[in-house]
Amino acid sequence: MNPRRKSRLKVVVLIMFSVAVAAGLTLYALSQNIDLFYTPSEIVKGKNNDPQLKPAVGQRIRVGGMVVEGSVKRDDKTLKVEFNLNDIGPAITVEYEGILPDLFREGQGIVAQGVLVEPTRLKASEVLAKHDENYMPPELGDKMKQQHNAVGVAEGDLKGESIRDKAELDRTFNTLQGESK
């Protein structure tokens, strides 16, 4: 092989090696910022009720659900707050130190991001509250529909409008129309 070809080959190999190292470092950096989304039921039972698919203790995750009524405990001396979060199944405990969003309250849907410190305990670094009574993050809505359908809850019940509620509204509406004639 002549010297010119050798030098070109060295340059090509060096460039390919540099690109491979850069790609590897980029993928490593991105993997550190990926937070998988779970519902409280999936944390306790695993995704699709498979215990093999539970998040590991120490893993960074995002979890979405509803704040359980009566579960919020605030520390009088610090900004530490502890509350339970559930969907339709079991609840997990979330601990957070910081200022909660204005829309945070019991019975409210939230998404918490943090590290799983015990199998059912999340140390949150960020808590996000939904913006109005109808908003739900798409991923949380999809997961809750899957959980509810598996348990036998009707689609209308997820929206707070069961068939019984709609029938009651129809009767009230018809009664009011009859009185106005």
UniProtKB/Swiss-Prot annotation:
Compartment annotation: Cell inner membrane
Binding site for heme: 131, 135
Keywords, alphabetical: Cell inner membrane, Cell membrane, Cytochrome c-type biogenesis, Heme, Iron, Membrane, Metal-binding, Signal-anchor, Transmembrane, Transmembrane helix
Keyword set includes ATP-binding: no
GO terms classed as biological process: cytochrome complex assembly
Function, in words: Heme chaperone required for the biogenesis of c-type cytochromes. Transiently binds heme delivered by CcmC and transfers the heme to apo-cytochromes in a process facilitated by CcmF and CcmH.
PANTHER family in the cross-refs: CYTOCHROME C-TYPE BIOGENESIS PROTEIN CCME HOMOLOG, MITOCHONDRIAL
Protein name: Cytochrome c-type biogenesis protein CcmE
Lineage: Bacteria, Pseudomonadati, Pseudomonadota, Gammaproteobacteria, Pasteurellales
